[in-house]
Each structure stands twice: as C-alpha cells, then as structure tokens.
C-alpha cells in the first residue's frame, strides 16, 4: 500500500480541492466530505454530482452538527479510549447495487500496463516450487492450502510454463480469476460498498485490485488531468516504488472496498509470472453479508481531512489525519509482519511518538523501520521475511530483514530458510550490496553456520559463482571466509532422489488382465465364469428363477417342495457343466415307505405324467442357467471395457503432463540461455565501449564533420584555431553524452549517422553554444559545457 515516504515529494495540486488521496480515493468520499466542506457552495457542488457518483439524493449526507470538525475532533480525541470491538454488522438485507455501480467505470479483467517493463518484480527469475502433480478426480490438487508449497508461502503464483507441479495447480488464483462471491451495495454514508455474498474463511482470496499500471511521471500527470476534468476522487494504489495502479476509469469491483480503522481484509502483493499484482484477502473469518473493508494507509494531500465513517470503537475520526502534517502513514501488513512489529493501535507511547515525529517533519515510515529492533526468526516469520525480500526495492527495509536472518541461529529455523530459497536470497543480496564489506562478511558467516547435509540446494541456487567472486576480494577476511565456504560446499555430496515414474510410463499388466474390447468372446456354452463370479451366478440364477416362476406358475407348481434339494443347489455347486449342475435335481425325491403306509397311499404317478414333469423341469432350468451365464458374461465384458477405457484415458493424461513438463523445461532453458546471452553481450558493451573504441571514433568523425559544416560561418568571428577547438569540444560533449546513454541501456549502440531530428536539435544547440562563446570573448573559463538531451527540445537543452 501507499506510504507517506513514497509520495512525500508530491506537492498539493490545488489547496482548494476538497481532498486528495494519493494511494486511495473513492467516489464514496464525495458524500463524506459534504458535512465538512468549507462553504455551502461546495456542498451544493457535491450534491449536484451524487447521481454521477452512484448516490440517491434522498440519501443525503449527515447534517453539519453530526460531521462538523468539532464533532470529528471529539471522535479523534476519544480514539485512545480502549473499547470492546462491536459485533460485525450485516448488510445482506439491502438490495444489490452492482448494475448501477458498473456504470460508473469500465470493468476490465486484467491490469493494463503502460509499458512492457512496468510492474516487474526486483528479481524476475522464475521461482520453481518443489511440489509434484497430484490428481484427484481429474483435478490437480498440488500447491493447495496447507500444502507447504514454497511459492504459495512466499506470495508467488505457480505457472504452467515454469513449474513442475503440473498444469492448473491450486496456486493459480490470480491467473484463473478465482474471486470470492461478493456484491456491491449502497451504504448510508459511504456511497458504494462491497459485501461478502458467502461465508469467507480467513486468508480467502477476495478480489484482485485491477486497473491501469502507470509510472510516477504519468501518475502526476493524471492527478492534474483528473483535477482539470472535475474528477474529485481518484483510485490510486501503489504497486511498488515509482509505479501505481489507477482504477479511476478502468478497474474491477475491488475499487468499491471501503476503508475501516479495524478492517476485516488486508492487501497483499503477489508475484504472478513476470508481474506484481495486488490482491485483497480475508484478515479473519467473514460472515455472509459483512462489508469488506481494509486500511487505506492514506497519505492525504489537500486542505481538508476526510471524515471516517467506519463506526469502529478505535476509529481515529479521519482518513489520513486532521491536517496535512498529521497524515499518518503506516507500513503494509506483510512488511509489519516481516519486521516483527506488533499492533500499536492502542499503545499511548507509540501514538505520542508518532505525533512528535510528524510535528518535526520526519519521514515516519523510514523512522519506524530504523527504530525496529531486529529479532531472530521463527519458522512462521521466515516465510514472511523471504516473501518481502523477493518483492521490495527498499535498501533500508532489505538490510533490516537481512539482520533478522543474521541473528537466527536455531538449526530448525535455518533449515526452513534454506528450504525457502535462502541461498537464492543471499545470492541476490551479495550482488546488491557487493561494496559493503561488513554486509558481505556477515552473509558469508551466516551461510557457514547453516546446517547442510547435501549440495542440492546450493547447486540449484547458482550461488557458488557469486561467492567465487569474493575469493579475490581486497579484504583478507572476506577472501578467507569465501574460500572456506566454497571448500565446505565442495566436500558435500549431491543427494540422489529416487526418480518418479516417468510421464507416459504404464505399469506392467498382470497375466490375469481382463480381455480388451477388440477380443472376441468365445461361445457361451464353452465359456466358464471365474471363481470370483460365483456370487454373481447365484444371484442371476435366483433372479431368473423368480422371473420364470411368475411367467410359468404351472411348471414350478409341479416341482418338488423339498427344501433340502433347493439348498443343495446353491451350497453344493462346484462344477460349471450342465450335467453336474442338474444331476441331483433331475428327478424329484420319492418319499420312503413306512410300515404304516398302505399301497394306495404310495402309488406313484403314471410314467407319462412323470416324464412330462421331468422334461418341463429340464427346460425351465436350462433357461435359468443360460440367463445367469449371459448376465455374468455381460458384466465381465462391461467391466473389462471400463477398465480399458480408464487405462487409455490415464495414458493420455500422463502423456499430456509429460509433454507439458518437457515444454516447460524447454522454455525455461531457453529463457536462461537468452538471459545469459544478453548479460554477456551487455558485459561486452560495458567493458569495451569507450571514447577510443572503433565505434566511438567512427561516431566522433560523423559529429566533427557535421559541426564543421553547419557552423562554418563562425570561423571568421572566432578565428581558425579557436573555431577548430570549439568544434572539437562540441564533438567530445555529444560523444560523451551518447556513450553514457549506451552504458545506461537507454540506447542499444552508438548511431552510424544522425537522424533529421537529431541534426536539427544539434544545429540549434551548436549555434547557441558558439553565440555564447562569441559573446564571452571565447575565453576557456567562460565556455558553456551543457550538452543537449536528444529527447529534449532546444529550449530545454539551452
């Protein structure tokens, strides 16, 4: 977020403007400023624009008695009273105002960058996490919440091109626009607001703050432009030093998130690919219907303060302080956590100290960082520190965070730092502070004290060439420690990791595999079911028996009712042949004669009836067993088909992941090669481009010829010797200017010839130069030496 130190150089554009918020401004402030405006005319001016700002006229601002400076001052004086936090207020009963809010700006899906180089982090190398693809129901759940993904813990999003965690992992919320369910509603005093449309757990990604990313020069220009257009309220958020997100005319719903002195959300900066992006996250569990708010960290510019209507017990009464000198700047949430600063909200001593600093005009942000007493890291704070070190460009903050790492001696915490790319961080810091002997010495000593078992992390970070440069350092202590560190690293071995199964590799199939789809099925009567399908056969037989009993009750009524024969059919089933299956059930059992039976009672049916009954039983049972075998066979075939389809689909998924992985490795290798090639070319230019280089001599001849021809009329006024001296002097000035542009990467190389625009500018400058020489009698001590900038007009050059 915006801090006072980052914009303290700005001057108020117009003291009559009601309010200016350099980091944040909302159309809701138009209503807030009505009660405290200096005159009634300004109040009417605001009210006439309520419809344009999305406000209803019947929802007017509070009366002066409720929002006057005196009442606001009383709120400010009572802010030090410790009060209990109020329960969250819910607004889900209010109607949605999203459609109306969308008419006040142009909604865009991605940030729009003013140039290709803007929005890039300090270190633009791809960070690869250690996670591996883990697929559940077709979804890659790698790098999810609680997965200890290094990228996720250090506010870096994974990308499919540069990581081995697989495509579409869970750490791609910015890229996939996985925003929370939110809605826009109309507040009582603050204009539009943003509310949760569902219960949101802590640390949920709410929304990305989207807009136009512009440099500081364009930011200043837009401040003046919006002021001339009559736009009273701007939407600027600082992305990093010298770069801002402007959501005034183009943005997302995140622009409607209001300020609160006790917010339920916070803003965090994430590295997504080669760009930095700002997101709003839940600071605590949020209930559906709650308004989503965060601390604006405002540095105000203007004559009047903006009253705060958050309604919290700790409310300071104003956004940005009562006066311009009291504009309170705060550190971003992630920076405070990285520095180990505890909440100062209710501390009287800290409030008094801040007041004194503001009265003396001291840069409060820098002073806070300087006054922080570094403490050793814990495993939890290590992730915060590494995340900020990868994003910040502030040298003071970097040194303070590195001091915390230097003080850390706990082996478990040191191992956590190493796992969180500690060697990468130290490599960057050694390059950044390469002339600070004390910093270099402490860095090398810290790495010497780290526990190390293998060489893997050291090799992956490419820190050895960086330390190797200090082996020839002029300081003997630095040289000795660097050699000792390299010697210890060389004695370590690279740990061998058991390789995972390669993408596309399929486990060997067993000999009992199910038949594939293209295999022809043998005839039903020759195919025997597997032993594992015995239960399926019994079930199919029972079902078929029940169906036939319903269709042919006469056939089944003549079947013997001996329960023992039916139970033997199921329990004694061993063979799958029809003969063995019906051997015991072909004929009904005859009842054994007893002594008391008479011949008439034991008389058997005639042979014809018995033969018909037996034949019907055979037909019936043949149908049952045929239906059962067919049912089992169909199940086996379907099962085999399903397994074969799943196996083919798995092969395709693995092949796709393998190709994506190989492609990402190729792209990563290509980027590294291009970076090395570019750095070597730049180094060649830096070391060989001087005023005596062949290209410099050639360009010098072009300049000398140009100045001699275009300024020949001054030869009579100055004399031949003096004229030649001045031509030589002008040539050297312009040559030196171009060499500086090439060395600073603003120009690729010295031009072979001068363009028409360059000739015009140089001719005007040369005439002014020689006129000045003539007017000053051509003395060497009074000769002008200012050189023109090729991109400037002749007036500016003069």
Swiss-Prot record:
Residues 304-320 form the Post-SET domain. The modification Phosphoserine is found at residues 67, 594, 596, 787, 789, 793. It catalyses: L-lysyl(36)-[histone H3] + 3 S-adenosyl-L-methionine = N(6),N(6),N(6)-trimethyl-L-lysyl(36)-[histone H3] + 3 S-adenosyl-L-homocysteine + 3 H(+). Its EC number is 2.1.1.359. It is an enzyme of class 2 (transferase). Keywords: Chromosome, Coiled coil, Methyltransferase, Nucleus, Phosphoprotein, Repressor, S-adenosyl-L-methionine, Transcription, Transcription regulation, Transferase. Residues 180-297 form the SET domain. Pfam families: AWS, Med26, SET, SRI. Histone methyltransferase that trimethylates histone H3 'Lys-36' forming H3K36me3. Involved in transcription elongation as well as in transcription repression. This is Histone-lysine N-methyltransferase, H3 lysine-36 specific. The gene is set2.
């Amino acid at each position: 977020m915006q801090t006072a130190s980052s914009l303290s150089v700005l001057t108020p554009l117009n003291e009559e403007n009601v309010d200016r918020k350099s980091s944040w401004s909302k159309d809701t402030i138009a209503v807030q400023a009505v009660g405290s405006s200096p005159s009634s005319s300004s109040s009417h001016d605001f009210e006439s624009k309520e419809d344009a700002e999305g406000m209803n006229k019947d929802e007017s601002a509070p009366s002066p008695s409720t929002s006057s400076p005196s009442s606001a001052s009383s709120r400010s004086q009572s802010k030090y009273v410790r009060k209990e936090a109020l329960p969250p207020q819910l607004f889900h009963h209010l109607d949605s105002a999203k459609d109306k809010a969308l008419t006040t700006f142009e909604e865009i899906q991605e940030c729009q960058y003013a140039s290709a180089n803007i929005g890039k982090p300090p270190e633009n190398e791809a960070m690869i996490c250690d996670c591996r693809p883990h697929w559940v129901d077709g979804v890659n759940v790698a790098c999810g919440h609680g997965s200890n993904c290094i990228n996720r813990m250090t506010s870096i999003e994974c990308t499919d091109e540069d990581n081995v965690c697989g495509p579409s992992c869970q750490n791609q919320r910015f890229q996939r626009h996985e925003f929370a369910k939110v809605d826009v509603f109309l507040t009582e005093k603050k204009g539009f607001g943003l509310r949760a449309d569902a219960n949101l757990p802590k640390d949920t990604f709410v929304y990305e703050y989207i807009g136009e990313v512009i440099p500081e020069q364009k930011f200043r220009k837009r401040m003046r432009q919006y002021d001339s257009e009559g736009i009273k309220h701007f939407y600027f958020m600082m992305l990093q030093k010298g770069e801002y997100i402007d959501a005034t005319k183009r943005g997302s719903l995140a622009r409607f998130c209001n300020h609160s002195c006790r917010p339920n959300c916070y803003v965090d900066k994430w590295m997504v690919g080669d760009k930095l992006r700002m997101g709003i996250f839940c600071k605590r569990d949020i209930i559906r219907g709650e308004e989503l708010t965060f601390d604006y960290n405002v540095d105000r510019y203007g004559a009047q303060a903006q009253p705060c209507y958050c309604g919290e017990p700790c409310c300071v009464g104003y956004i940005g302080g009562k006066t311009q000198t009291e504009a309170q700047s705060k550190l971003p949430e992630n920076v405070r956590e990285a520095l180990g600063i505890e909440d100062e909200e209710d501390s009287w001593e800290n409030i008094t100290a801040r007041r004194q600093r503001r009265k003396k005009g001291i840069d409060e942000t820098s002073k806070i960082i300087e006054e922080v007493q570094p403490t050793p890291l814990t495993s939890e704070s290590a992730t915060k520190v590494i995340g900020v070190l990868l994003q910040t460009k502030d040298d003071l903050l970097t040194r303070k965070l590195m001091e915390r790492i230097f003080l850390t001696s706990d082996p478990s915490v040191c191992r956590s730092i190493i796992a969180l790319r500690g060697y990468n961080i130290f490599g960057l810091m050694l390059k950044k502070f390469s002339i600070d002997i004390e910093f270099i010495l402490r860095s090398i000593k810290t790495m010497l004290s780290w526990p190390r078992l293998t060489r893997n992390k050291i090799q992956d970070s490419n820190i050895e060439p960086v330390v190797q440069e200090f082996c020839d350092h002029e300081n003997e202590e630095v040289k000795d420690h660097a050699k000792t560190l390299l010697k210890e690293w060389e004695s370590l071995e690279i740990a061998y990791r058991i390789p995972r199964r390669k993408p596309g590799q399929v486990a060997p199939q067993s000999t009992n595999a199910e038949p594939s789809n293209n295999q022809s099925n043998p005839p039903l009567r020759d195919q025997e079911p597997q032993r594992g399908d015995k239960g399926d056969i019994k079930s199919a037989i029972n079902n078929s028996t029940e169906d036939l009993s319903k269709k042919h009750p006469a056939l089944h009524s003549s079947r013997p009712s001996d329960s023992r024969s039916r139970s033997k059919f199921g329990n004694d089933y061993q063979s799958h042949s029809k003969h063995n299956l019906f051997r015991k059930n072909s004929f009904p059992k005859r009842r054994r004669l007893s002594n008391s039976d008479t011949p008439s009672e034991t008389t058997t049916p005639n042979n014809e009836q018995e033969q018909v009954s037996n034949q019907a039983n055979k037909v019936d049972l043949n149908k049952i067993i045929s239906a059962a075998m067919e049912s089992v066979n169909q199940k086996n075939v379907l099962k085999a088909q399903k397994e074969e389809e799943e196996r083919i689909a798995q092969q395709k998924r693995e092949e796709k992941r393998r190709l994506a992985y190989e492609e990402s490795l190729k792209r990563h290798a290509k980027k590294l090669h291009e970076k090395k090639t570019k750095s070597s070319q730049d180094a060649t230019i830096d070391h060989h481009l001087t005023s005596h280089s062949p290209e410099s001599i050639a360009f010098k001849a072009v300049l000398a010829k140009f100045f001699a021809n275009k300024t020949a009329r001054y030869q009579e006024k100055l004399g031949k010797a003096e004229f030649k001296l001045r031509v030589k002097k002008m040539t050297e000035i312009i040559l030196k200017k171009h060499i500086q542009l090439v060395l600073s990467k603003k120009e690729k190389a010295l031009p072979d010839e001068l363009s028409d625009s360059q000739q015009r500018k140089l001719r005007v400058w040369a005439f002014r130069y020689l006129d000045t020489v003539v007017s000053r009698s051509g003395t060497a001590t009074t000769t002008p030496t200012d050189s023109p900038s090729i991109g400037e007009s002749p007036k500016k050059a003069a």
